[in-house]
């Protein structure tokens, strides 16, 4: 319970920081360049992340760092990357949502993904599926307009939109542009196949999914039943 309260406090702090930064946005990250995996590469500004209350693998030990280490360790004792069984692959898909907007789900998603990325033997893939209000893209400074929605719509390949960052073991799949039929895309067989592909292709990763609030959008309900079935 104490861990949960602490995380909620940090989430509230993030929201205050986002509000404060709306009139004076921080400068964007240093830049992007082509990466060997075929998609873009994003150079994250560590100072920018810290200003939003986001911890990075090289952060000094602090209350926030230790809280996310505890959550991460609990998850890792239950689900191990590299296990080829269907149940274990699907269990490494960790969906983070909230009841309403503004409750800190992106704060949790990003910090948890970076906590996994600090491990020596595993990696993290952070997937943004909040197409309506992507706080994640604001924090990371992602400018690309393509993402998972475009993959599902058949407009591009997964490898074209996966973003490799300058933080070791940490990749991002942005949301892409929203639209009236996003819930149908998320509930489709193509989404189930994409999740299965990601868990097979990235067997050494925990896949954190930053999901829209469940009481503000039908997207979360569409995504919840999607499990790795192949």
What are these regions (language model features)?
Residues 1-230:
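P-loop NTP-binding module
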């Amino acid at each position: 319970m104490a861990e949960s309260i602490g995380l909620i406090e940090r989430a509230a702090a993030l929201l205050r920081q986002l509000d404060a930064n709306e009139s004076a946005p921080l400068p964007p990250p240093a830049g992007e360049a082509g990466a060997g995996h075929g998609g873009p590469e994003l150079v994250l500004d560590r100072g920018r992340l810290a200003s939003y209350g986001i911890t990075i693998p090289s952060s000094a030990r602090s209350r926030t760092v230790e809280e996310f280490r505890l959550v991460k360790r609990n998850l890792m004792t239950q689900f191990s990357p590299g296990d080829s069984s269907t149940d274990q692959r699907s269990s490494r898909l960790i969906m983070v949502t909230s009841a309403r907007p503004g409750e800190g789900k992106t704060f949790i998603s990003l910090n948890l993904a970076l906590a996994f990325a600090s491990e020596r033997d595993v990696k993290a893939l952070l997937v943004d599926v909040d197409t309506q209000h992507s706080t994640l893209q604001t924090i990371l400074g992602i400018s690309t307009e393509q993402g998972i929605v475009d993959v599902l719509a058949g407009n591009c390949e997964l490898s074209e939109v996966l973003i490799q960052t300058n933080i070791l073991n940490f990749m991002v799949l942005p949301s892409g542009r929203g639209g009236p039929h996003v819930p149908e895309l998320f509930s489709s067989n193509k989404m189930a196949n994409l999740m299965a592909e990601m868990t097979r292709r990235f067997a050494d990763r925990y896949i954190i999914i930053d999901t829209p609030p469940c009481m503000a959008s039908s997207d979360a309900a569409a995504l919840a039943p999607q499990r790795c079935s192949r």
